[in-house]
Amino acid sequence: MEETPRSVGEASTTNFVAARPSAKTDDAVTMRGCGFANLALVGIDKEELRGRLAMPEYLRIAMRDCIKRKDSTEISDHLLLPGGAAADMAPHAPMVVFINPKSGGRHGPVLKERLQQLMTEEQVFDLTEVKPHEFVRYGLGCLDTLAAKGDECARECREKIRIMVAGGDGTVGWVLGCLGELHKDGKSHIPPVGVIPLGTGNDLSRSFSWGGSFPFAWRSAMKRTLHRATLGSIARLDSWKIVVSMPSGEVVDPPYSLKPTIEETALDQALDADGDVPPKAKSYEGVFYNYFSIGMDAQVAYGFHHLRNEKPYLAQGPVTNKIIYSSYSCTQGWFCTPCVNNPALRGLRNIMKIHIKKANCSEWEEIHVPKSVRSIVVLNLYNYGSGRHPWGNLRPKYLEKRGFVEAHCDDGLIEIFGLKQGWHASFVMAEIISAKHIAQAAAIRFELRGGDWKNAFLQMDGEPWKQPMKSDYSTFVEIKKVPFQSLMINGE
């Protein structure tokens, strides 16, 4: 399972498949976002753009009222079939924007004002005031109610509406998760989502060609961004459900994205486990779009998050954050402490077994955990850690030798790779070498069992937590593909 040098390849694109962007494509998007191509934007007229995006006023008011009342079934009579309704035409590309004012530093409030100028006030939602699930349930529900009563304009807006999210990867995932409820309810016409990057890593934004950072010349760039959002093709994105099952009675402080199940569950007693399978288990479940990891990288992230929460004055910007993060990596032993000095710092195979299901296979298969690996990452996107590509662009001969296929974010497979000591991780993140390729899988089951380790450190899409372990009972982490795919707008 040797590392392999990277090979450079051009990405292919289609109207419906999210292909891996090449470095050239990503750089071009970043240049556009930073205003280098703004001379080409002169032809985008502000009023013409507004006409393509803005829904009729009566629909905007009806949606606003339904969201405020949290009821999409009762709509004021004067909004049902207003005078002249036949003359109201649906815009070419009805759109709403969710903005996280806590992202992007000082840009949040002024960006909200700028978007309201380009669209309408009612079509820009502040996430501190209107949550995504409220819009999905009551805003889209309002359009469904009006359409069911014969309002053709409402029906067309509901079918064509697109969503832009101004925030980081966590905010985008939040919106995608709420839209997933439409799939569960059997609804059609799921709105696709585009991104205005306001976060730190912005890997979802990079993966769909929306750039890796908030544009420098942002006021003029917003016209171009919204225009691209009206024209962009639709791509698909896999998402993955994670279930963490531990012995009943264990106490864990999970991240926001991981929710406890209502009832205790009984685990399959036929599981091939090193430790005993508890008769009853407490379970938490959630969904991730980018990555899940176990090991030293999660431990460093956990310590950094706690330090930042306890002493926020230390983390005043991205440069300071990176310095603190690097220092914390060293004090935790990833760089500066030999792996053999402390049992708690040894390879993950001392506490872990991994089983996978390959594509079109119903049987679990155990895979080898390399002894040198101190972090294991399960990656869905091509981009990781602010645009790095740890899986790499692998040559066809290597793919054939390992039994791999070229990785895509919509192929129903997920990549598993390992990071060794901190220096190895640094070379991987610098894209000098690829990570330790372990497997591609359609489903994964981790078994964690204590001993010298009392806790394991896990993280999901950047949210870390400390997972208690027992030596007599196993803790299981199971990852399976969500049966439906999210829809994304390509920014190219």
UniProtKB/Swiss-Prot annotation:
**Domain of life where this protein originates:** Eukaryota
Its Enzyme Commission number(s) read: 2.7.1.107
Q: Provide the transmembrane region boundaries.
A: none
- Per the UniProt annotation, how does pH influence activity? Optimum pH is 6.8.
Task: Quote the Pfam families the UniProt record gives.
Answer: DAGK_acc, DAGK_cat
Q: Name one GO molecular function term.
A: ATP binding
> Tissue expression, per UniProt?
Highly expressed in flowers, and at low levels in roots, stems and leaves.
- State the reactions this protein catalyses: a 1,2-diacyl-sn-glycerol + ATP = a 1,2-diacyl-sn-glycero-3-phosphate + ADP + H(+)
Record-linked SUPFAM superfamilies: NAD kinase/diacylglycerol kinase-like
Q: Which UniProt keywords apply?
A: ATP-binding, Kinase, Nucleotide-binding, Plant defense, Stress response, Transferase
The DAGKc domain extends over 90-248
Q: Which GO terms describe its biological process?
A: defense response; leaf development; phospholipase C-activating G protein-coupled receptor signaling pathway; root development
For the keyword Transmembrane helix, the answer is no
Spell out the PANTHER family in the cross-references.
DIACYLGLYCEROL KINASE (PTHR11255), DIACYLGLYCEROL KINASE 7 (PTHR11255:SF115)
Q: Which family does it belong to?
A: Belongs to the eukaryotic diacylglycerol kinase family.
Q: Assembly and interactions? A: Monomer.
Role according to the record: Phosphorylates the second messenger diacylglycerol (DAG) to generate phosphatidic acid (PA), another important signaling molecule. PA is required for plant development and responses to abiotic stress and pathogen attack. May be involved in the accumulation of PA during cold stress xhibits high specificity for 1,2-dioleoyl-sn-glycerol (1,2-DOG), 1-palmitoyl, 2-oleoyl-sn-glycerol (1,2 POG), 1-stearoyl, 2-linoleoyl-sn-glycerol (1,2-SLG) and 1-oleoyl, 2-palmitoyl-sn-glycerol (1,2-OPG).
User: What name goes with this protein?
Assistant: Diacylglycerol kinase 7
Its gene is DGK7
